[in-house]
From Swiss-Prot:
It comes from Bacteroides fragilis (strain ATCC 25285 / DSM 2151 / CCUG 4856 / JCM 11019 / LMG 10263 / NCTC 9343 / Onslow / VPI 2553 / EN-2). GO terms for biological process: one-carbon metabolic process; S-adenosylmethionine biosynthetic process. GO terms for cellular component: cytoplasm. The lineage of its organism: Bacteria, Pseudomonadati, Bacteroidota, Bacteroidia, Bacteroidales. Pathway: Amino-acid biosynthesis; S-adenosyl-L-methionine biosynthesis; S-adenosyl-L-methionine from L-methionine: step 1/1. One of its GO terms (molecular function) is ATP binding. Catalyzes the formation of S-adenosylmethionine (AdoMet) from methionine and ATP. The overall synthetic reaction is composed of two sequential steps, AdoMet formation and the subsequent tripolyphosphate hydrolysis which occurs prior to release of AdoMet from the enzyme. This is S-adenosylmethionine synthase. Its EC number is 2.5.1.6.
Amino acid sequence: MGYLFTSESVSEGHPDKVADQISDAVLDKLLAYDPSSKVACETLVTTGQVVLAGEVKTGAYVDLQLIAREVIQKIGYTKGEYMFESNSCGVLSAIHEQSADINRGVEREDPMNQGAGDQGMMFGYATNETENYMPLSLDLAHRILLVLADIRREGKEMTYLRPDAKSQVTIEYDDNGTPVRIDTIVVSTQHDEFILPADNSAAAQLKADEEMLAVIRKDVIEVLMPRVIASINHPKVLALFNDHIIYHVNPTGKFVIGGPHGDTGLTGRKIIVDTYGGKGAHGGGAFSGKDPSKVDRSAAYAARHIAKNLVAAGVADEMLVQVSYAIGVARPINIYVNTYGRSNVKMSDGEIARKIDELFDLRPKAIEDRLKLRYPIYSETAAYGHMGREPQMVTKHFQSRYEGDRTMEVELFTWEKLDYVDKVKAAFGL
């Protein structure tokens, strides 16, 4: 007998993601002007208010208020009726200098001996059920919201859309872990109050709400989902769509009040959306707002890079990689591998872990260098997942009245590159 598995995603306008994007925009601006910056930037967003807090060690000076407002405007919070608007919201900063006690454990005369910025365990996961080696349920949940955001920005259809949205996808698997069909799709999207009640009675309000919901449900099924399906190239994934999918669209009946006005948002509260949608495991450390000396972020990217390259090389059909660190110590305490009984090599998971230790240098500075993490590459990670994205070169422009203008070429999502497949095949005799 098979089973059902569910993953969710949230849009760039979700309050927690607004916070993540502001934190990573601050990080990027600091790295653009001082690549050695040590940053831990936390953001809180609520009705008409942004609060920045955290610890920073940098030689750069940036306009935090301007950074926050630019992010909020780009997301789409540009109307006063949202009760959170880029030009009028307050921006408070309580950012201060990084602890000297932490810094002494990280800085070393030889940079390669740089210690981990904290203790903890980090996980990387990969599966061959999708072309990007991600869990299908999460991949589809992200895709739904990416297309929904495109529709909102185009402004031609579903013109009532507001920035906040969530999706959830449930997949049925057979006993062998192979996707069989899509069972349920949930889409909750914030919207304008585009149908007004005939009068002030509760009955008239209910009637207007029901009419709005009927329009939104019809548009999700007839406008959004066909565009989602059209964006998929893989025949096996397309075959999972069927006429019996259960759709839950705005199940509360109404979603006008949303974004940071509806719910307070905090950096680092969507760590499962950021990673593998509940598949694999998570060590608990969030990513956004942290420079790569924080192994919560850099080692999680490295573990994904390892798992993806090993699965792509054919070592296993599915793989979980754990690494752990002690603060101030460069080399990881352990490397753990779980192939879920789906290994394709005549080696134990422990032997695979030892091979990984030989192939990949997991000291923090080595990870930074290998994955090019000391560059302003993080804003793009802060919505729609840090994993499963497309590696690409982009040109970025930074402006500062304090530091001048800067233009640079950077490589995004380097941990998604399949650049170790040949080395892995050679090491494992594949």
